[in-house]
């Protein structure tokens, strides 16, 4: 992305003006996953404020954008009401578009895709479909296998997915997102 363009593009596409952030740090203090991120939310904001292409590229390659769980704690705590979860969504889209995904984040992306495929196929989350899709994508078939029997016995892994009403509406949502 050309210098001087990504800050205005973010503002236009996401409605987030990164320059409004005055680095109070409340977003990072309230973030449930900040300690696992390579760049906590306040640092993401600062890196974008520098308008440096190296920082922008580093963010696209970072785990931070994939670890964000969009809980909106940062938005709730931000005195400037900066929508960091929307910004993180945008950064994930750009990372996918520019094929700059961090290899460590591939499992997170695989989980996202397995989750969406499960909802798309059944109209709601089907746990066994989610696990099967995730394990097939990551080729990590045996990890966590030991917890499956107890989850099954507690009714947490139904063999047949529940039917949902108005599955056509859910299909329509997925169709619209492809447009």
Feature locations, PLM:
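Juxtamembrane/interfacial segments around transmembrane helices
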Residues: 69-77, 116-126, 158-172
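C-terminal, charged low-complexity interaction regions
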Residues: 143-179
């Amino acid at each position: 992305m050309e210098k001087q363009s990504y800050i205005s593009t973010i503002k236009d596409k996401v409605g987030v003006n990164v320059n409004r952030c005055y680095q109070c740090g409340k977003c990072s203090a309230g973030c449930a996953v900040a300690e696992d991120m390579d760049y906590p939310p306040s640092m993401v904001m600062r890196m974008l404020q520098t308008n440096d292409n190296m920082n922008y590229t580093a963010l696209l390659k970072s785990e931070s954008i994939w670890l964000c769980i969009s809980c909106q704690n940062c938005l709730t705590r931000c005195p400037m009401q900066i929508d960091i979860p929307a910004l993180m969504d945008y950064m994930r889209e750009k990372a996918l578009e520019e094929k700059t995904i961090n290899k460590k984040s591939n499992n997170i992306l695989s989980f996202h895709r397995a989750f969406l495929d499960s909802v798309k196929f059944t109209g709601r989350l089907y746990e066994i479909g989610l696990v099967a899709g995730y394990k097939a994508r990551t080729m990590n078939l045996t990890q966590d296998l030991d917890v499956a029997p107890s989850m099954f016995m507690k009714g947490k892994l139904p063999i047949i997915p529940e039917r949902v009403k108005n599955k056509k509406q859910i299909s329509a949502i997925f169709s619209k997102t492809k447009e």
